[in-house]
Curated annotation (Swiss-Prot):
The lineage of its organism: Bacteria, Pseudomonadati, Pseudomonadota, Alphaproteobacteria, Hyphomicrobiales. RuBisCO catalyzes two reactions: the carboxylation of D-ribulose 1,5-bisphosphate, the primary event in carbon dioxide fixation, as well as the oxidative fragmentation of the pentose substrate. Both reactions occur simultaneously and in competition at the same active site. Its cofactor is Mg(2+). This is Ribulose bisphosphate carboxylase large chain. Its EC number is 4.1.1.39. It is an enzyme of class 4 (lyase).
Length: 486
């Protein structure tokens, strides 16, 4: 969409009263973004009768320096520099009322190393702006100069693998089920059986903190006893994600320190704690040589719908800057939202040294990562051993595959469920390394392995008909049609 700048110049720019945003300098179609600019792509849905150019200029204004009327104090600032600039508006393919608005922000508008400050502008009051039916932050380009003000993941994929001494395959985990109600002793039994059976990790779920049925100290003690026994029994390094999420930072630090003192190598936090708490825990994890796992609890309240909110690809970028080592990023084949092409984009953001623009995966900008450590994506939610060929093909080696119900729901017990998943993974990795077509031969490869592994045979029989084939609500706009889950 092309429309010339209508910015009012000179003294008329500062006349008292209300002025269109585009005339105030927030629409600059000839602007060439600088390498140091923060660039955002918004999906805007204007109210009926609202011009999309004016809507884009309004988003630029309300997310940077503007208010609803002209203020004389603009003349006391370098307004030309600090005003965000909407410089391009494109109609969203296959829509009549949605537009992609590209907006550039001067780097000086943001505090170094602060996700809280960045988000206060980019997704602040502007998301309640009445002239818009909907507003969604689709993607951001964060310049190298800004990226380098963040610590990034404290451990990273390479060092995590070195600590675990596990290479050449995805890591295996399981969320303890039921997520609520177990006593500390029984919780620890689940952890031990799963780790002894072949998993690398177990984890707390997002809402297990410190409830009447199980105090957090009790859980930590029983879990670490289970980890130590499983390590002794198997000769492998094991771990369990101890959720330190709590009401205050003081409580979270206390729990994290207790986990460290018990010998844990990993702690967990929930996305709902907020960005300041997340960055604080990431700095603590770096100081204490701990892996930090982020459960994305709550994200779908604002990432799932296409017309309003924030895309998860943006959340993944912010999380990598903030410094978490793991993040739940979707499974494609599981029970939770996950378009294949879109999920591929999420995984690229986590693991790339430089993420290239790829519209078919929902990536709108090239993104340099300035040597920040890579972040391990986690696949969790409704997956089982019978999908192992799909998971390995779609998600690759550098991921954690978490089979909660797919381990603990095994008809032969928890240890058997873990063994089934470990055998399924190792037979699939071996077949891939031998050059076999695991996508098409996957079921056959699993059946071959199951002939000498009863737990795997039982898993394949139990969940053979379980699929979650629903069309995704968040597929790339530059694909021809929405892609159904595999």
């Amino acid at each position: 969409m092309d429309q010339g700048s209508q910015t009012i110049k000179g003294k008329d720019r500062y006349k008292s009263g209300v002025m269109e945003y585009r005339k105030m300098g927030y629409w600059e179609p000839d602007y060439e973004p600088k390498e140091t600019d923060v660039i955002a792509c918004f999906r805007i849905t204007p109210q009926d009768g609202v011009d999309p150019i004016e809507a884009a200029a309004a988003v630029a204004g309300e997310s940077s320096t503007a208010t609803w009327t002209v203020v004389w104090t603009d003349r006391l600032t370098a307004a030309e520099k600090y005003r965000a600039k909407a410089y391009r508006v494109d109609q969203v393919p296959n829509t009549d009322d949605q537009y992609f608005a590209y907006i550039a922000y001067d780097l000086d508008l943001f505090e170094n190393g602060s996700i809280a400050n960045l988000t206060a502008s980019i997704i602040g009051n502007v998301f309640g702006f009445k002239p818009l039916k909907g507003l969604r932050l689709e993607d951001m380009r964060l310049p190298t100069a800004y990226v380098k003000t963040f610590q990034g993941p404290a451990t990273g994929i390479v060092v995590e693998r070195e600590r675990l001494d596990k290479f050449g395959r995805p890591l295996l985990g399981a969320t303890v089920k039921p997520k609520l109600g177990l006593s500390g002793r029984n919780y620890g039994r689940v952890v031990y059986e799963a780790l002894k059976g072949g998993l690398d990790f177990t984890k707390d779920d997002e809402n297990i903190n410190s409830q009447p049925f199980m105090d957090w100290r009790e859980r930590f003690l029983y879990c670490m006893e289970a980890v130590n026994k499983a390590q002794a029994a198997t000769g492998e390094i094991k771990g369990t994600y101890l959720n330190v999420t709590a009401a205050t930072m003081e409580d979270m630090y206390e729990r994290a320190e207790f986990a460290r003192d018990l010998g844990s190598n990993i702690i967990m936090i929930d996305l709902v704690i907020g960005w300041t708490a997340m960055q604080s825990m990431a700095k603590w994890a770096r100081r204490n040589n701990m892996i930090l796992h982020l459960h994305r609890a709550g994200h779908s309240t604002y990432t799932r719908q296409k017309t309003h909110g924030v895309s998860f690809r943006v959340i993944a970028k912010w999380a990598r800057l903030a410094g978490v080592d793991h993040i739940h990023a979707g499974t494609v084949v599981g029970k939770l939202e996950g378009d294949p092409a879109t999920t591929k984009g999420y995984y690229d953001i986590c693991r790339d040294e430089f993420t290239h623009r790829k519209l078919e995966n929902g990536i709108f900008f090239d993104q340099p990562w300035a040597s920040l450590n890579k972040m391990m994506p986690v696949a969790s939610g409704g997956i089982h051993a019978g999908q192992m060929h799909q998971l390995l093909d779609l998600l690759g080696d550098d991921t954690v595959l978490q089979f909660g119900g797919g381990t603990i729901g095994h008809p032969m017990g928890i240890a058997a469920g873990a063994t089934a998943n470990r055998v399924a993974l190792e037979c699939m990795v071996l077949a891939r390394n031998e050059g076999r077509d695991i996508v098409n031969e996957g079921p056959e490869i699993l059946q071959e392995a199951a002939r000498s592994c009863t737990p795997l045979q039982q898993a394949l029989e139990t969940w053979k008909d379980v699929t979650f084939n629903y069309t995704s609500t968040d597929s790339p706009d530059y694909a021809v049609t929405a892609t159904a889950s595999v």
